[in-house]
């Protein structure tokens, strides 16, 4: 099962329940597009993997012991400077899509509490890990996106963070029988699972196929749970 918006939403809620309020004790970057946060919460250590690999982007706890480079990458060094000993405020999915925000309360060089946000975007070859400050300004990212690479959205230190372009789809949280039926009708004469995928944000074909087998009321429950 791919990590679509539905799966990611369940994962985010589970992760938030375990590590919200926890302290970040260690940060490593075993691969170019993967970060591991060691979070201490409720007397338990959790290793949280955030991976922006184009082929296998994902978010989950792990017990794996990764091999890390002798010299930490620049992005990892910045994350350590900005996030070490910070407190996790929340892990949340944005708009039912495959975007995760991890909000962290930390202390800057002046001793003031500041907000930092670590963003995981799971978007195939456009997947990314991005760190922003409390005003939404990009501090750095695993992958920089220049104007030459994209005229729609750039990802560079110093620029304001812009979310991925939106789609005219239902947020799973807002799904009910009435609006789901309206969107399915709007999708036209296509198989039901394709209509669901085209109507609800973050839905993959495998998830849509499973949901299409259920009555509408049960489908609404699964989507908006």
Model-derived features: positions:
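Phosphate/anion-contacting hairpin/loop surfaces
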Residues: 43-225
